[in-house]
Amino acid sequence: LHKEYRRQRQMCIRDSAKSDDKHLQERGHNKAYCCYYHAPVLVIVSNKPTQWWAGMDCACAIENMFLAAHSLGIGSCWINQLGTTCNDPEVREFITSLGVPADHQVYGCVALGYADPKAPLKEKVVKEGTVTIVE
């Protein structure tokens, strides 16, 4: 890729464990809600929406973060909320103060932390017919 396009993707890393900012800790009037599941680190991945591949570029970066985190024994989770709310004036002001460029669209966030070993794991059931093998 041309170096100009490679430089467009931006990652803003927030140490949310040290944050007392209510924007990250609460949403609306539900005090129990936490959009990043109380993870100690939140990575906000954004890009200029001027190219059709901007979202895919961010998705690839996020997936690579998931793979790297897993290799280090760190849990990860894709967070979508900022992708749909980043252009709300209050949210935009807040994420710009964190370092997200004003002309960027947020395509996803990554919550990183160590999994709670006591938390029950949900068994994933793959529905029949959702995978097709073409020979």
Go through each PLM region and give its residues.
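Short acidic (Asp/Glu) patches
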Residues: 19-30, 90-94
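Helix-biased detector of long, well-ordered alpha-helical tracts
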Residues: 27-31, 44-52, 131
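Short, surface-exposed beta-edge/turn micro-motifs
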Residues: 39-42, 106-107
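Short, charged beta->alpha transition segments
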Residues: 11, 26-36
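Single conserved hydrophobic/aromatic residue that forms the stacking wall/gate
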Residues: 1-13
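Small-aliphatic-rich amphipathic alpha-helix that forms the alpha element of a beta-alpha
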Residues: 43, 48-94
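Short secondary-structure boundary/capping segments
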Residues: 3, 33-35, 98
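C-terminal helix-cap and adjacent tail motif
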Residues: 100-135
